[in-house]
Curated annotation (Swiss-Prot):
Superkingdom of the organism of origin: Bacteria
Subcellular compartments: Cytoplasm
Positions contributing to Mn(2+) binding: 21, 209, 211, 245
Name of protein: 2-isopropylmalate synthase
Required co-factors: Mn(2+)
Length: 520
């Protein structure tokens, strides 16, 4: 490994610890086969180093590490080990099949950990670091040493620990913010001072590993990079102990979007980010929140009318990266009560509807009325609104009443005709739909022969509406109609009127069965 002038390189190594630190998140454990599936995705994503597990902790981890070692030949495969001889020996054996193995040893260094966890003095910690890094280097050339709880460690002692680890053969020095305690200014200064002052620092890569307990993991990782770190330890979706780790998708896209500021790059194939995120969500059953940066469902969604109008003019007004660059198909214009007319018309055009000014105004009024009843308006809802608008060009349903009369049903319908006059008719039938269609035929004077009739749901969850679809014949010609409503019977009436109004318009234009009618 060439580590000369390593902390001046413009390349940031991405060390993904989803399969080790991430898996320690409650409820996120994976089987060896699941780990292998996830590791393949991380390999395809372009991750430099994959931390595959903690072999000394379980047989399952040892099996998973061995499986990954036999299959994955490009990335460096790392395993975690305590500063214990038995751990290091187990870890080295687990990595025997790996093409590019790394042994990652760690020891706590903060006064709190030294006193209450390790019960060791400064001198004992230094001796252990030297002994176990030397032992690890005897098995594998690529050794990473982590000073656990580095950001709460006295800086003079942290410098001494770092010097000893480098002298013993460590090739990467990781300074973790184990409990998410530090701030960007503090961690930037810590890295900058240590890299400038520790003997041998120019021979190794300095790494940052930040937790998110105060929501600063990504910001602290960027600050560490500014201080000279050239490896970032992170996880997909930010999963990990407690509040999680720095999210790979956040740190990667921050460096890419702000490339002119940082002048640094990664090897991450960013269009694979979303699919990798979604794979992890399926494997561990832990969905990300909708407003999660980069991979959340709302990351590229816009509902505000002002924002939507800006996006329609130029997407850069409200997006700093392209959704396609991280694996989303496109931005989403979420239509809801905050949406403006421009966004509604744009979506209707995308669905194939070209509206005149008066039509657009009417549909937008109907859209706003629908938004008072449901939170999100889908494409199916818009198509239903267009259908309703078409119906309103002829006969309009004013009211209807369906009742049982013995074994038969009775329907009373009241319509507004094209001139605005009210027309009321009743009819009986073998069921509510049969009676309804009979009353509509009497009211409009249009006779339709029913061939097929179907109903199904459109929309999402509690906002779903019923859609009625029917196929009918008139003078031997087949027609299809649809209607939607919260009420299935009303949807059926609208579907029938859809056909009837179309026939009436054809008559007005002198068109019959698709041909121009002869004029006497």
């Amino acid at each position: 490994m060439n580590t000369t002038v390593s902390n001046q390189t413009p390349h940031i190594r991405i060390f993904d610890t989803t399969l080790r630190d991430g898996e320690q998140s409650p409820g996120c454990s994976m089987t060896p086969q699941q780990k292998l599936v996830m590791a393949r995705a991380l390999d395809a994503l372009g991750v430099d180093i994959i931390e595959t597990g903690f072999p000394a902790s379980s047989y399952s981890d040892r099996e998973a590490v061995a499986m990954m070692g036999r299959e994955l030949r490009r990335p460096t495969l790392a395993v975690l080990s305590r500063c214990l001889q038995a751990d290091i020996e187990i870890s080295a054996r687990a990595l025997e099949a790996a093409a590019n193995p790394r042994l990652h040893v760690f020891l706590s260094t903060s006064p709190l950990h030294r006193e209450h966890k390790l019960r060791m003095s400064r001198e004992q910690v230094l001796e252990s670091v030297h002994k176990h890094v030397t032992l690890a280097r005897g098995y594998i050339d690529d050794i990473e040493f982590s000073a656990e709880d580095a950001t709460r460690t006295e800086e003079d002692f942290l410098a001494e620990v770092t010097r000893v680890a480098i002298a013993a053969g460590a090739t990467t020095i990781n300074l973790p913010d184990t409990v998410g305690f530090t701030t960007p200014e503090e961690i930037r200064g810590m890295f900058s001072r240590l890299i400038a002052s520790v003997e041998g620092a120019e021979k190794v890569i300095f790494s940052t590993h930040c937790h998110n307990d105060l929501g600063l993991a990504a910001a602290n990782s960027l600050a560490a990079i500014e201080g000279g770190a050239r490896q970032v330890e992170c996880t997909i979706n930010g999963i990990g102990e407690r509040a999680g780790n720095c999210a790979l998708e956040e740190i990667t896209m921050a460096l890419k979007v702000r490339g002119a500021f940082y002048n640094l790059d990664t090897a991450i194939n960013t269009p694979r980010i979303v699919s990798t995120s979604q794979l992890l969500q399926r494997l561990v059953g832990m969905p990300v929140q909708r407003n999660k940066a980069v991979v959340g469902g709302n990351a590229f969604a816009h509902e505000s009318g002002i924002h939507q109008h800006g996006m329609l003019r130029h997407r850069g007004t409200y997006e700093i990266m392209r959704p396609e660059d991280v694996g989303w198909e496109s931005s989403q214009m979420v239509l809801g009560r905050h949406s403006g007319r421009a966004a509604v018309e744009q979506r209707l055009r995308a669905l194939g509807y070209l509206l005149e000014e008066d039509e657009a105004k009417l549909v937008f009024e109907q859209f706003k009325a629908l938004c008072e009843k449901q939170r999100v308006v889908t494409d199916a809802d818009l198509q239903a609104l267009m259908q309703d608008a078409t119906v309103q060009e002829g006969y309009r349903l004013a009211s209807m009443t369906i009742s049982d009369v013995g074994s038969r049903a009775n329907a009373l319908v009241e319509l507004s005709d094209p001139d605005g006059n009210r027309v009321a008719e009743t009819a009986q039938g073998n069921g509510p739909v049969d009676a309804l269609f009979g009353a509509l035929a009497s009211a409009t004077g249009v006779k339709l022969e029913l061939d097929s009739y179907q109903v199904h749901s459109v929309g999402i969850g509690a906002d779903a509406r019923g859609e009625a679809s029917l196929s009918v014949r008139h003078d031997g010609v087949e027609y299809e109609g649809t209607g939607t409503s919260k009420d299935i019977i009303e949807a059926s009436a609208l579907a029938w009127l859809d056909v009837a109004n179309r026939l009436l318009r054809q008559r007005e234009r002198g068109v019959v069965a698709g041909k121009t009618a002869a004029v006497a």
